[in-house]
Amino acid sequence: MAKRLDLNDVNIYYGDFHAVQDVNLHIPPKAVTAFIGPSGCGKSTVLRTLNRMHEVIPGAYVKGEILLDGEDIYGPKIDPVAVRNTIGMVFQKANPFPTMSIEENVVAGLKLSGEKNKKKLREVAERALRGANLWDEVKDRLDKPGGGLSGGQQQRLCIARAIAVEPEVLLMDEPCSALDPISTLAVEDLIHELKEDFTIVIVTHNMQQAARVSDQTAFYSLEATGKPGQLVEVGPTKQIFENPTKKETEDYISGRFG
């Protein structure tokens, strides 16, 4: 079951550097929320805090609350690995395990969790590949290396790997930036289907993509280089693109800066 996320007074730091300040944001379930904004504004940084991925960077920490259906994912008794199973991540560059087979790629997370039943692993692989709209393209070569797929297929393989562990939320950090237009369209179509089962947050530099795939858009910016990024405006995507309330948002959407 998809879950909501709520960010309350979130501030993100890398050591002494204040990267993002005072973010308050509601991310609804079974919808796509897009993060947009100029480079360096903190949108990918915020995305990575949503499943504690930023913690792999020494000195990184968060102040404030990030709640998943009301539970603080930074609570003292919360296991970061469990958070990352519940809130999956798809990265900018497709990163399948190149020497693993297609099927092994999809079920890698389950195997790490101790699942050994071959029948169940095969069933999960098929379900996840179907969910990623990839099954019909690879069903006759599941034993072939994942690294042998095209770029667009590799990205959908990574999406299949993410959804195989049945997360509640799916984070996507510029998932189409390295793809050709046809592969991009395939991933965008997939995002529309996935939101029926998952809460989705996507970072994108592509304004047209944000307008096409998202239900809600959050615009981030920063006053100057070296200053913290901040959430300027959030609202329904149609409103943000057609009638934003902040001039800074309008300037960015219209291409006057960024």
Swiss-Prot record:
UniProt-annotated location(s): Cell membrane
Membrane topology of the entry: Peripheral membrane protein
InterPro entries (alphabetical): AAA+_ATPase (IPR003593), ABC_transporter-like_ATP-bd (IPR003439), ABC_transporter-like_CS (IPR017871), P-loop_NTPase (IPR027417), PstB-like (IPR005670)
GO MF terms, alphabetically ordered: ATP binding; ATP hydrolysis activity; ATPase-coupled phosphate ion transmembrane transporter activity
Chain ranges of the ABC transporter domain: 5-253
Principal EC category: translocase
Cell wall biogenesis/degradation in keyword set: no
Known catalytic reactions: phosphate(out) + ATP + H2O = ADP + 2 phosphate(in) + H(+)
Quaternary state and interactors: The complex is composed of two ATP-binding proteins (PstB), two transmembrane proteins (PstC and PstA) and a solute-binding protein (PstS).
Known function: Part of the ABC transporter complex PstSACB involved in phosphate import. Responsible for energy coupling to the transport system.
Protein name per UniProt: Phosphate import ATP-binding protein PstB
Organism: Corynebacterium jeikeium (strain K411)
Gene: pstB
